[in-house]
């Protein structure tokens, strides 16, 4: 009987040690998983920074800096405004003369609807 109790005790102790080893293995696995996740995150962040740097280099090479774009837009806008001012200056007198002609030179005429009505009325009267 004592040997059975001792055998049971040994089995319980072995089961306890096995459970501890399983728990330790789970903890190590969890720790390795966390570490792998952190390493992967660091690698992703490094790759992201690298691609961002490449994009900035590409952008600067082909598009120029933001200030360059602003100054180019400003120059283009000023050129367009100056062109419009020159167009106004060169056509101003002709527009004034044309407006005065349209306002002052009145040619009385019958409205085209009235003319059409007279033509239609004349067809039915005949």
UniProtKB/Swiss-Prot annotation:
<dbReference type="GO" id="GO:0000221">
    <property type="term" value="C:vacuolar proton-transporting V-type ATPase, V1 domain"/>
</dbReference>
<keyword id="KW-0406">Ion transport</keyword>
<dbReference type="InterPro" id="IPR005124">
    <property type="entry name" value="V-ATPase_G"/>
</dbReference>
<keyword id="KW-0813">Transport</keyword>
<keyword id="KW-0375">Hydrogen ion transport</keyword>
<protein>
    <recommendedName>
        <fullName>Probable V-type proton ATPase subunit G</fullName>
    </recommendedName>
</protein>
<comment type="subunit">
    <text>V-ATPase is a heteromultimeric enzyme made up of two complexes: the ATP-hydrolytic V1 complex and the proton translocation V0 complex. The V1 complex consists of three catalytic AB heterodimers that form a heterohexamer, three peripheral stalks each consisting of EG heterodimers, one central rotor including subunits D and F, and the regulatory subunits C and H. The proton translocation complex V0 consists of the proton transport subunit a, a ring of proteolipid subunits c9c'', rotary subunit d, subunits e and f, and the accessory subunits vah-19/Ac45 and vah-20/PRR.</text>
</comment>
<feature type="region of interest" description="Disordered">
    <location>
        <begin position="23"/>
        <end position="45"/>
    </location>
</feature>
<dbReference type="GO" id="GO:0046961">
    <property type="term" value="F:proton-transporting ATPase activity, rotational mechanism"/>
</dbReference>
<dbReference type="GO" id="GO:0098793">
    <property type="term" value="C:presynapse"/>
</dbReference>
<dbReference type="GO" id="GO:0016887">
    <property type="term" value="F:ATP hydrolysis activity"/>
</dbReference>
<dbReference type="GO" id="GO:0043068">
    <property type="term" value="P:positive regulation of programmed cell death"/>
</dbReference>
<dbReference type="GO" id="GO:0012501">
    <property type="term" value="P:programmed cell death"/>
</dbReference>
<comment type="similarity">
    <text>Belongs to the V-ATPase G subunit family.</text>
</comment>
<dbReference type="Pfam" id="PF03179">
    <property type="entry name" value="V-ATPase_G"/>
</dbReference>
<dbReference type="GO" id="GO:0097401">
    <property type="term" value="P:synaptic vesicle lumen acidification"/>
</dbReference>
<feature type="compositionally biased region" description="Basic residues">
    <location>
        <begin position="26"/>
        <end position="35"/>
    </location>
</feature>
<comment type="function">
    <text>Subunit of the V1 complex of vacuolar(H+)-ATPase (V-ATPase), a multisubunit enzyme composed of a peripheral complex (V1) that hydrolyzes ATP and a membrane integral complex (V0) that translocates protons. V-ATPase is responsible for acidifying and maintaining the pH of intracellular compartments and in some cell types, is targeted to the plasma membrane, where it is responsible for acidifying the extracellular environment. In neurons, required for necrotic cell death by promoting intracellular acidification.</text>
</comment>
């Amino acid at each position: 009987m004592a040997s059975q109790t001792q055998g049971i005790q040994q089995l319980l102790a072995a089961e306890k040690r096995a459970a501890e080893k399983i728990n330790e293995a789970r903890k190590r696995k969890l720790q390795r998983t966390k570490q792998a996740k952190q390493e992967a995150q660091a690698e992703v962040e490094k790759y992201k920074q690298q691609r961002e740097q490449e994009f900035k280099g590409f952008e600067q090479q082909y598009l120029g800096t933001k200030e360059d774009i602003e100054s180019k837009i400003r120059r283009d806008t000023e050129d367009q405004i100056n062109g419009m001012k020159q167009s106004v200056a060169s056509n101003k007198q002709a527009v004034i003369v044309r407006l005065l002609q349209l306002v002052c030179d009145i040619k009385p005429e019958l409205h085209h609807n009235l003319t059409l009505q007279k033509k239609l009325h004349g067809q039915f009267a005949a």
